[in-house]
Amino acid sequence: MLNTTSMAMPRELTTTQKAARGVLFQCLQKMEIGCLTVIESFKTETTERSERFSTPNGDYNSEPVAATIEVKHPGFYSRLLQGGSIAAGEAYMDGWWDSPDLTALMKLMALNLRALDKLEEQGSWLTKLLYKFSHWSNRNSEENSRKNIHAHYDLGNNLYEAFLDTNMLYSSALYNNADDSLEQAQINKMDRLCQQLELKPTDHVVEIGTGWGAMAIYMAEQYGCQVTTTTISEEQHAYAEQKIKERGLENRITLLKEDYRNLTGTYDKLVSIEMIEAVGKQFLPSYIKVCESLLKSGGLMAIQAITIADQRYDYYSNNVDFIQKYIFPGGFLPSVTSLTQATTKYSDLVTRDLFDIGLDYAKTLNEWHLRFNRAESEVRSFGYDDRFVRMWRYYLSYCEGGFLARTISAVHMTFQRP
């Protein structure tokens, strides 16, 4: 049973707002882990109302889990009830609520998804239907893929330069040592994938998802490989093209602007870093078939993928979240089991290695968030407004909290074509 304590009564809410608050608080009483304090500060009086929801099991992995949310707008409760977790993100973007530690709050919520699922069930069926239709309309057909990639990766290279490492890697790093810098951890990540591929100078590697060119350049310079790499992002293509020329690697690296479905030829090795999330559930079979077709017999394939917990996969597959609506339109996280089952069903690829780097991703996101905050004035100078800045803070904390709670993770998976 949860204990709730109340201070002074708030300004009178409307009947609808009171009812919505009551539903939310009932759901919060079903929390199983941690402690949440809800503070209402939207009233004109000097007094505040505070509700504290605490569970007998306040720890996670022997560490206390506690967070605070400050509600700044009386319409927050009904908005949340109507639109669920997506509306929570939208309300944050609009400044309707805040938290002194947003990541701690996201972690606490991720640890109590069963309680929050009950809240989602209370939402408007029409709103849910509209979310699903919007997500379906963004499915990653060849035409839509370009639009979806453009929506996130073509925001401007200067935005990403403000918070990424010097090599511009927008994917999880690998912290071999606790004191590794972000730059070193990103090199660790690239080198581990190269080791998994058993790269040698005679290899011709195909990379699906160039990013800003760091992995292709690393493989060419450090392992002497021939690399063919593709991206459908205009901004990334232009940036990678310039970097390849600056390094004098035009004879080693072939840079394409092709959808993965249009790639031809056969290669010794294949690498793809956090591109599979942009494939979509519907197109996962074709992605796997294409990857297999690009590999020579005996060829190795290494991917880095963000994954949803197996236990959440069915629920996630049938719903739409904040990231899919605002950050990565058309995005979809596979689970480890769904990936292995799909490769078994749609190819002859054999799984050779599985390596989890979920907590490394949490640390990577934390570093990105710190850098993003330090660069806030620079980001605003690019023309991004307060709502955009808050959206990105929410996105970074939302993801870090999920990785810390293990509801999402990231893996290196290595496959081989017989």
Annotate the PLM regions:
Residues A240-E241:
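Conserved SAM-binding loop
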Residues R261-L270:
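A short acidic, Gly/Pro-enriched loop at the edge of an enzyme's catalytic core
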Residues W212-Y223:
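Conserved SAM-binding loop of SAM-dependent methyltransferases across substrates and taxa
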Residues T307-P418:
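Substrate-binding/catalytic lobe of Class I Rossmann-like enzymes that use SAM or dcSAM, i.e.
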